[in-house]
Amino acid sequence: MVRFGSAASSDNRRRRCWSWYWGGLLLLWAVAETRADLHYATVYWLEAEKSFQVKDLLDKNGDAYGYYNDTVQSTGWGILEIKAGYGSQLVSNEILMYAAGFLEGYLTASRMSDHVANLYHQMIKNVITEQKVKDFMQKQDEWTRQQIKNNKDDPFWRNAGYIIAQLDGLYMGNLEWAKRQKRTPLTKFEISFLNALGDLLDLIPALSPESRNNGFLSMSEISKMYEWDMGHCSALIKVLPGYENIYFAHSSWFTYAATLRIYKHLDFRIIDPQTKTGRASFSSYPGLLASLDDFYILGSGLIMLQTTNSVFNISLLQQVVPESLFAWERVRIANMMADSGKTWAQTFKKQNSGTYNNQYMILDTKKIKLRRSIEDGTLYIIEQVPNLVEYSDQTTILRKGYWPSYNIPFHKVIYNMSGYREYVQKYGLDFSYEMAPRAKIFRRDQGKVIDIESMKRIMRYNNYKKDPYTKHNPCNTICCRQDLYYMTPVPAGCYDSKVADINMAAKFTAYAINGPPVEKGLPIFSWVHFNETTHQGLPESYNFDFVTMKPVL
């Protein structure tokens, strides 16, 4: 039931306004680069009217309040920060989440439109594919909403309901912005498309006639998407020899058309005994309620990183059905409900869609005592294929110094089911877990990581002209530059890095950089050479530095 909280006394109100005044000054100092970049807004739930209202100001009495700092052109990143459920009235969790989504949609609608323009035709090539995707996603959405309605006492589905409420609010916020600006809003499907971007990497092949074949993708077929199109990434967790510190980092690989970035700090005060946290700081994109990369610092003390595993055995994709939850939805549910790597895995494995088949790394900072011990359960590795989620505690490996991730499954059952064993036999050791180029480079260079700066360097590493392990391929390295490949240059590859340590994580702080690597004399990427690729709202070239990401509200 939605109800208002008790009225504050005039003294309390004065104190609140005074603290808000100083907090507002601090916020302006901390986040504003130019006033034109910065947009504050607050969403209110109007109980009597059963409707939402948004105002262009920061009011901590509102049901959701925050800002978007649009500094993509100057730093490579926009910054979105939203707090919800901390206002003067008590609202239901669903109202709270809807308000948070509404605010995000309202603040970032223009960038959401840019992101759709840049990626829609990269992902959906023709009207036949478009209709198949629309039909599948409509069935999946209807099934999800019915499950939420039918299972109100089930904590899993209750938390799923919070996320769908946020998604609905996102659409309505985009609608409100479009109405005020006299612009065409994004459709519900376009917003669903944005959130399902990762899942579409497997869903689109699953809906193609080729998936009905009981075989494997050939090298010529996979070469069209290999390295970047399947969302490949690099990740590393590094433990110093005396447990003095633990660093974690992630570098995303995808089309450079996806470099419209937003780093998000979200803090939702969800009151539910089965919701462990509503707080997260993560790298993301316009209109996405999840990270996609993935790189999360969670209020539960968990860190989540992810890299994608290809499914070469396309017969597995026959098991993809709409009666399931997409990976982005299950990630959000697990992030909210879990307080350990094991409970994260157990939550995530439910209602497996078999899309966006990844390796997830869950680092539990609560189990780490620097300079003393790393307890069992500190690192869980979770991997998915259609109809199976495998997970295990791999803290023993982490204690030896590092955990690398480079788009090859760790668990033998996932590795074999996905077709990697056959690929090694046909195409060589580049597809093996132990002897892949990035496995060798991480093994050789991880010992050089001694501080945050050296962690940044390894995650931006690309010395393909001289490194013997790359074989002169600009993508056989930690941070790929497919645009430099002499045979078929494509504007794609490694386009960001996020780096932090566990002390920074306690403050929801990280360093992030947007753009392909320029280390070792590599040229700065510019769209001048790839103008045929839609890049609406993106910087013309990328030579940014690392930015410190830290919540200020």
From Swiss-Prot:
GO terms for molecular function: phospholipase activity; toxin activity. Glycans are attached at residues 69, 313, 416, 531. GO terms for cellular component: extracellular region. It is an enzyme of class 3 (hydrolase). It comes from the Eukaryota. Expressed by the venom gland. It is found in: Secreted. GO terms for biological process: killing of cells of another organism; phospholipid catabolic process. Keywords: Cytolysis, Glycoprotein, Hemolysis, Hydrolase, Lipid degradation, Lipid metabolism, Secreted, Signal, Toxin. InterPro entries: PLipase_B-like, PLipase_B-like_dom1, PLipase_B-like_dom2, PLipase_B-like_dom3. Its EC number is 3.1.1.-. It holds the Pfam family Phospholip_B. Only two tryptic peptides have been identified. Belongs to the phospholipase B-like family. May cause hemolysis. This is Phospholipase-B 81. It comes from Drysdalia coronoides (White-lipped snake). The lineage of its organism: Eukaryota, Metazoa, Chordata, Craniata, Vertebrata.
